[in-house]
Amino acid sequence: MIEIIPAIDLLKGSCVRLVQGDYNEVTEFNDNPSQQALLWQTLGAKRLHLVDLDGAKTGEPLNDSAIRKIKEKLSIPIQIGGGIRTIQRAEDLIELGVDRVILGTIAIENPNIIEKLSEKHPNKIVVGIDAKEGKVATRGWTNNCEMDATELVKRFSQTNIAAIICTDISTDGTLMGPNLDFLRELALISTVPLIASGGIGSISDILSILPLEQNGINGLIIGRALYDGAFDLAEALKVVKNQDLQDIVNANKDQA
């Protein structure tokens, strides 16, 4: 069953969302991230996705105080990404009790670190692949490179990582629906579980992802749709738990 994972993006200690990774388009949803995290757990989340946006952009861990408070309040696993560019930083977060650390920029710039960390900490390391039109972006999406996302998936499928998070930048924060072709292409290549991220704006969007479970998608990160009230977390969890094939067919027809 695909796991629904609510997201909290941290910027200057607050819970925010960006549109397509643009730091000039920031919407603040809650200035108390630990309170927001506890709400997601109370509503049924089994895992929380955290992103340190300051860290992603600058490489500096500017939101550790908020991260510690969230960890103290929750009993569910936490995965965190954003600015984790050294072995020491990754291990500090694991020592803090974070279940999984997500490495993006460093995975592209120094892939050997992924191999070392995943050997030492099996099932604790996740690679984040953020791409636009199939090309990977790094450093908080401020730097575009000519590397294909498919090549990265092939490489990291040979390591002991726990999963790969695939984010299509062109859909992230837009509520316009996921890039199913992009997700399907990567899922068919990968030999490790994939977690989809970006574009979810309705229950129909969730339903459209469910058939990809057979291709290796086992998680779905949702952010802005939950904060905007497009649907609530309990509803999303119920839909995945009680998925009906006819509902999926109808959802795909609606999107055709």
Swiss-Prot record:
Pathway field: Amino-acid biosynthesis; L-histidine biosynthesis; L-histidine from 5-phospho-alpha-D-ribose 1-diphosphate: step 4/9
Keyword field contains Hydrolase: no
Catalytic residues, chain numbering: 9 (proton acceptor), 130 (proton donor)
Enzyme Commission numbers on file: 5.3.1.16
Family annotation (Gene3D superfamilies): Aldolase class I (3.20.20.70)
Keyword Isomerase: yes
Single biological process term from Gene Ontology: L-histidine biosynthetic process
Membrane-spanning parts: none
A GO CC term assigned to this protein in UniProt: cytoplasm
InterPro entries: Aldolase_TIM, His_biosynth, HisA_bact_arch, Isoase_HisA-like, Isoase_HisA-like_bact, RibuloseP-bd_barrel
Catalytic activity: 1-(5-phospho-beta-D-ribosyl)-5-[(5-phospho-beta-D-ribosylamino)methylideneamino]imidazole-4-carboxamide = 5-[(5-phospho-1-deoxy-D-ribulos-1-ylimino)methylamino]-1-(5-phospho-beta-D-ribosyl)imidazole-4-carboxamide
Keywords: Amino-acid biosynthesis, Cytoplasm, Histidine biosynthesis, Isomerase
Organism superkingdom: Bacteria
Molecular function GO labels: 1-(5-phosphoribosyl)-5-[(5-phosphoribosylamino)methylideneamino]imidazole-4-carboxamide isomerase activity
Localization annotation: Cytoplasm
Similarity comment: Belongs to the HisA/HisF family.
NCBIfam families listed in its UniProt record: 1-(5-phosphoribosyl)-5-[(5-phosphoribosylamino)methylideneamino]imidazole-4-carboxamide isomerase, PRK13585.1
Name assigned to this protein: 1-(5-phosphoribosyl)-5-[(5-phosphoribosylamino)methylideneamino] imidazole-4-carboxamide isomerase
Gene source species: Prochlorococcus marinus (strain SARG / CCMP1375 / SS120)
